[in-house]
Curated annotation (Swiss-Prot):
Pfam families found in the cross-reference section: PdxJ (PF03740)
Active site (catalytic residues): 48 (proton acceptor), 75 (proton acceptor), 199 (proton donor)
Keywords recorded for this protein, A-Z: Cytoplasm, Pyridoxine biosynthesis, Transferase
Alphabetical list of NCBIfam families matching this protein: pdxJ (TIGR00559), PRK05265.1-2 (NF003624), PRK05265.1-3 (NF003625), PRK05265.1-5 (NF003627)
Localization: Cytoplasm
Keyword check for Repeat: no
Biological process, per Gene Ontology: pyridoxine biosynthetic process
EC assignment: 2.6.99.2
Binding site for 1-deoxy-D-xylulose 5-phosphate: 14-15, 50, 55, 105
Protein name: Pyridoxine 5'-phosphate synthase
One term of GO molecular function: pyridoxine 5'-phosphate synthase activity
Organism field: Nitrobacter winogradskyi (strain ATCC 25391 / DSM 10237 / CIP 104748 / NCIMB 11846 / Nb-255)
Stretch forming the signal peptide: none
Length: 256
């Protein structure tokens, strides 16, 4: 596990595939964008193979695994089909997420506590295969404690509620959501979990959350793909990396 001083950037390439699939064919190339992001400083690539294949395809996952040299984080629902694909692909990590066909994006965290009995053998099989398992959950003590009992080594805190409140200018809700994240990250580390965060992050919120010492990785996609349309993927990655570094630098100042 990385030290608390380091912070990795995982770039989610799902919406490269969304643009590609709007017209069909193979352009823009998901793997080409992933390689460009890595060349610009991304520490890993995240891709979500949904059950309905609305953006990432099975062939994208296979190519990403074969062609990128940085860690591949395979987001997926906890289904037998996806488990089989993950075991065949052997990504660095799997992040288990809830999934509903009618949603536009992942709307909430996984109910690790409520689905404990189903998730326990599912996670154990991935662990036994040498795949790191992450659970995408809300910063809820009940869910965090369930993740630890399930022997998932990593959680990814769902930051969507906080990010949405920040963008909407709802300071009361933003403050409440932020407190949940801060307290959740501290609890997760105290029970031995590695803590990642993602969903809805932009330059400003990434800089803010980078100052939390418990967080070791941010996974960011939609915002970065939108920025890349304006300035290119390399410049977007460099700007995001700089924002994260500024946030992390405040941690070093506090602990100096």
């Amino acid at each position: 596990m990385s030290s608390s001083q380091s912070l990795r950037l995982g770039v989610n390439v799902d919406h490269v595939a969304t643009i590609r699939n709007a017209r069909g064919g193979d352009r823009p190339d998901v793997v080409r964008i992933a390689l460009a992001a890595i060349a610009a400083g991304a520490d890993g690539i995240t891709a979500h193979l949904r059950e309905d294949r609305r953006h990432i395809r099975d062939s994208d996952m296979a190519r990403l695994k074969a062609e990128i040299e940085k860690p591949l984080n395979f987001e997926m629902a906890a289904t037998a089909e996806m488990q089989g694909i993950a075991l065949a692909t052997q990504p660095h990590a799997v992040c288990l997420v809830p999934e509903r066909r009618e949603e536009l994006t992942t709307e909430g965290g996984l109910d690790a506590a409520g689905q404990y009995n189903a998730l326990a053998p599912f996670i154990a099989k991935l662990n036994d295969a040498g795949i790191r398992v992450s659970l995408f959950i809300a910063a809820d003590p009940r869910q965090i404690e369930a993740a630890a009992k399930l022997r998932a080594p990593v959680i990814e805190i769902h930051t969507g509620g906080w990010c949405d409140a920040v963008v909407e200018g709802d300071s009361g809700k933003a403050d409440a959501e932020w407190r949940r994240i801060v307290e959740g990250a501290a609890l997760a580390r105290s029970v031995g979990l590695e803590v990642h965060a993602g969903h809805g992050l932009d330059y400003a919120t990434a800089e803010t959350i980078a100052a939390l010492p418990e967080i070791t990785e941010l996974n960011i996609g939609y915002f970065m793909m939108g920025e890349a349309l304006l300035v290119g993927i390399a410049e977007t990655v460099r700007t995001m990396r700089a924002a994260m570094d500024r946030g992390r630098a405040t941690l070093k100042t506090r602990t100096a």
